Amino acid sequence: MSVAAPAHKRILLKLSGEALMGDDAFGINRATIVRMVEEIAEVTRMGVQVAVVIGGGNIFRGVAGGSVGMDRATADYMGMLATVMNALALADAMDKQGLIARVMSAIGIEQVVEPYVRPKALQYLEEGKVVVFAAGTGNPFFTTDTAAALRGAEIGAEVVLKATKVDGVYTADPKKDPTATRYTKLTFDEAMSRNLGILDATAFALCRDQKLPIRVFSIVKHGALKRVVMGEDEGTLVYA
């Protein structure tokens, strides 16, 4: 009996910094990051090419910094540096799982991580390495969601997988409304008209214009990433 082939060959996984905290109030929870890497390792060993964009909200949020009197651009650069720290932690955990990870930063910190160069990133993916994109887009005023959309389009990912703590997009907040139901799929226009806030407006527009589908799923749900990659009904698909 033949094993089913993955539905996706190349994916862009967007992880929030907050997802790395686990139940902690701040920073990186080692057990959480190890568990996430186990999920990533499973799909990588199925032959899926995986690129990751990581946020920095567990260490520093540029938006929050800007709101308390700090210059917004400075705060955003600090947020970008936070994503580099997260990317290094993620790559370290991947190395310990037997994966080969490469961190590529949108801002130059050559002694620590290599700069983002698109052909090099594509080469790494073809070689079966996991590429972790750090420092967002390298520009202030752009979120790591936008970086995920941008890098996803650049590397020719088949889908952007937005990993959250909820298993999809709901009609209302499932924690507050017991009648809330999960959308299995939505068009970009439907998601916009319902103001569901799946990604920020810039990221969402980029995905829509490039016809790059988004799937929202729970990273805390064991096996969810594999089910998404296999094309099963997991999370919520947003498509053109």
Swiss-Prot record:
It catalyses: UMP + ATP = UDP + ADP. It is an enzyme of class 2 (transferase). Its EC number is 2.7.4.22. One of its GO terms (biological process) is UDP biosynthetic process. Pathway: Pyrimidine metabolism; CTP biosynthesis via de novo pathway; UDP from UMP (UMPK route): step 1/1. One of its GO terms (molecular function) is UMP kinase activity. ATP binds at residues 14-17, 57, 61, 164, 170, 173. UMP binds at residues 56, 76, 137-144. Keywords: ATP-binding, Cytoplasm, Kinase, Nucleotide-binding, Pyrimidine biosynthesis, Transferase. The keyword Metal-binding does not apply. It is found in: Cytoplasm. Inhibited by UTP. Its main location: cytoplasm. One of its GO terms (cellular component) is cytosol. Catalyzes the reversible phosphorylation of UMP to UDP. Homohexamer. Belongs to the UMP kinase family. This is Uridylate kinase. The lineage of its organism: Bacteria, Pseudomonadati, Pseudomonadota, Betaproteobacteria, Burkholderiales.
